[in-house]
Amino acid sequence: TPIIKEFVGMPKENFQQAQTSSIVYYTESKDRIPQIIQWSMDSDRETIGKMVCELSNTDLREEIQHIEVPTLVLLESVFSFSKDKIEQQYAKLPKKELRYANKGLHFVMYDDFDWYIKQLKEFIL
């Protein structure tokens, strides 16, 4: 696909710049930014391209009804403004807990570590 070709064919410097530019949407933890960017740089770009395509084109709203185990979904704080839409997306997931962080972005485990650990412990115990 064009997206995969773009990821694979992009010069390393351009790819790194793209990752650096977009990271502001994923974490507020400035000290973690180099690590997260390095993960991207170390990843297989064809796999990243496939992942982007799959995430953009795959609707699992029907399939999730077959998940039988209790499921914890941790969401970044910005999604709390769209609770109705989020709950619609997970409506068929039978044993779910949707929890919204009070702060942070995609890497909520870095942005609000204490909240993240608390949610995991409460869910598991």
Can you name each region flagged by the protein language model?
Residues 8-65:
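Conserved alpha/beta-hydrolase catalytic His-Asp/Glu region
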Residues 70-110:
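Conserved loop-alpha-helix segment in the C-terminal half of the alpha/beta-hydrolase fold
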Residues 57, 66, 91-92, 125:
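Secondary-structure boundary motif
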Residues 10, 24-27, 88-93, 124:
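Alpha-helix C-terminal capping segments
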Residues 1-5:
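Terminal domain-start segments
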Residues 110-124:
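Post-His helix in hydrolase/transferase enzymes
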